[in-house]
Regions:
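A solvent-exposed, acidic/Ser-Thr-rich amphipathic alpha-helical stretch
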Residues: 24-71
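Hydrophobic/aromatic beta-strand elements that line small-molecule binding cavities or substrate pockets
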Residues: 68-74, 85-86, 99-104
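Short acidic-aromatic low-complexity motifs
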Residues: 1-30
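Short beta-strand segments enriched in hydrophobic/aromatic residues
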Residues: 27, 86-88, 102, 118
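Short, cysteine-centered beta-strand-loop-beta hairpins and adjacent loop/turn segments enriched
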Residues: 88-97
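Residue-level signal for well-ordered, solvent-exposed loop/turn and beta-edge residues enriched
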Residues: 32, 94, 110-112
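Short beta-strand edge/turn micro-motifs at domain boundaries
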Residues: 99-118
Length: 118
């Protein structure tokens, strides 16, 4: 898959709530994920199993999702970016909206790195 195809598929899956499927189909086994800070867990994790565990931990911290908005991707070379807005009630933290920019790197048709800015 091209970077554009990976980007479009990631956005489509996420818009339909198929977050687990993104890891299984679009990410490399040694993919790296970098958060802006460590307020919700480790700042950096590497490896598909670690990325999946991070996603499970995030979802476990949510009492209720009220809405998710994901932009169309902007693609340049082997990278793409999307904006992501999550309106959710978090356990022990209340309801909040999180806005972030997500940047992904693609190699050989798989996401090898993701980084979040918020």
């Amino acid at each position: 898959m091209t970077t554009t195809e990976v980007a479009q598929q990631l956005v489509e899956l996420c818009r339909h709530g198929k977050f687990d499927e993104t890891h299984q189909t679009l990410f490399a086994d040694d993919a790296k994920s970098t958060e802006a800070d460590d307020s919700m867990g480790p700042r950096v994790v590497q490896g598909l199993d670690a990325l999946k565990a991070k996603a499970v931990a995030f979802q476990a911290g949510v009492e209720e999702f009220h809405g998710v908005t994901i932009s169309d991707p902007i693609v340049a070379g082997n990278s793409f970016a999307i904006t992501w807005s999550v309106d959710a009630t978090f356990k022990g933290r209340g309801r909040m909206t999180m806005d972030e920019v997500c940047v992904y790197q693609v190699k050989d048709g798989k996401v090898i790195a993701e980084q979040f800015f918020y």
